[in-house]
Amino acid sequence: AYYPFEKQGAGWDFSRYDIAFFQHLEKRVAQLGALGIEADIILFHPYDRWGYAKMQHEEDYAYLRYVVARLAAYRHVWWSLANEYDFMLKDKPMEVWDHFFEIVQENDPYDHLRSIHNGNVTMNYDHTKPGVTHVCVQNWDVKRMREWRAAYGKPVIDDECEYEGNILRNWGNITARELVHRYWICIVYGGYAGHGETYEHPEDILWWSKGGVLVGESWPRLKFLRGIVEEGPAEGIEPFAGSFPWGRTAGGGRGNYRLI
């Protein structure tokens, strides 16, 4: 197992970074690049049994500068400031998250894409802030895509519109058809969506968290949908305005091109 910091007694020395961990991380990032896959690097998350989510602010700032210095040279890297940042607000209040964006932007000479992911659907970050390049939301209600586009004026990704799978959690047991339907709504409303699978596995290997082999039925359908989108205008499409029928029926277009 690799850990980002060196051990110090029973705990960690947050001022000393484990070189082997970051060499391994760089290897994996490079492998994704070789496959033509964008690497959205999650910098913080609340699901932590090592104490990393509760570092002091100055330790957080130093860590960010170090990670950006190591990974910014990879052209396919994006920065996700956090997975479900709002679950860490007790230890990292909003002004700290704002400063995190500033640090990443100031230390990345290549100005990679930057965003942040909410947990509670009512806790979207203020994506109008200048350090945010695109909007990331977690929300099952993909029909709000037009609302988010209008509110933030930036590209929108619903990167957790729930998962195809069969686990007990309600966010991880929608059907393949439902996930593809949500993708369709996101795309025709002028946005993007994230894909994942959460099928039970005898060795508890969920693709959602550990990768591996996709076993579901949504990914080939999404491949077909991608083909439809790529056959359309290179500039993309704009969602149709108005509440009826386009509040209930996803539709968009550009010029004489229509998707409904």
Q: What is each of the regions a protein language model found here?
A:
Residues 47-52, 83-87, 112, 118-127, ...:
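Active-site clefts of carbohydrate-active enzymes
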Residues 57, 90, 169-173, 215:
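Hydrophobic alpha-helical scaffolding
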Residues 69, 106, 149-150, 188:
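Solvent-exposed polar/charged
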Residues 1-144:
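Active-site mouth of glycoside hydrolases
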Residues 31, 148, 185:
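Hydrophobic/aromatic ligand-binding patch that stacks against planar heteroaromatic rings
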Residues 165-166, 179-260:
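Aromatic- and carboxylate-lined catalytic core of secreted/periplasmic carbohydrate-active enzymes
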Residues 34-36, 153, 190:
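Glycine-centered short loops/turns at secondary-structure junctions
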Residues 39-40, 156, 193-194:
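Hydrophobic beta-strand scaffold residues
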